[in-house]
Amino acid sequence: MIIEPLSLTSARWRELEQVYGSAEDIGALLAALYANENDDERTELWYGVWATLCPDGRVFSAAYAAVPHVMEIAANRDFAERVAALHFVTQVEVSRHQSGAPGIDEDLLLAYASAVESLPARVAELHGITWDEQTAQVLGAAVLAGKRQHALARLLLQHGVGE
């Protein structure tokens, strides 16, 4: 069964929240990430995703709709971008269990859950590449988040590398 994420052009984005209020522009931000091939511009777009949807460990409802897209966007990208995307999804999953985080609306739940549950498989795709400590920290947390061990994933993300 194929689970479709929220369409990037759906009016539903207006009903979701990001750090600055309505998430009506998030579909366009994600569409730009799908389409843009310029590395510098992609870096700015990724910054926009983090800054609007999961800044400082806080999560907003539009992040739940964005997560399946983020996984799809990064699927065929280079190693660093794939790790960054897995980090974002892991942070969203960890943050949604914090006090005050918004719940996941029913219409977003299946696509979101499917994306989160795919984290361990996405990490396994990167097994043949050498990981530095920070990458191992992020990818270890991603496996834990995908296995619904959000408290352990949070601890791993919060633990300083080299401590």
Regions found by a protein language model. Name each.
Residues 37-38, 77-79, 131-133:
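Short inter-helical turns and helix N-cap capping residues of alpha-solenoid HEAT/ARM repeat scaffolds
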Residues 1-12, 17, 93-163:
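Long, helix-rich interaction regions
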Residues 4-6, 38-50:
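HEAT-repeat alpha-solenoid elements in large eukaryotic scaffold proteins
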Residues 23-32, 65-73, 118-122:
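Alpha-helical solenoid scaffolds in eukaryotic proteins
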Residues 49-53, 88-96:
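Hydrophobic residues within the alpha-helices of tandem HEAT/HEAT-like
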Residues 44-49, 85, 135-140:
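Conserved hydrophobic register position within alpha-solenoid helical repeats
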Residues 66-67, 76-90:
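Helix-rich alpha-solenoid scaffolding regions
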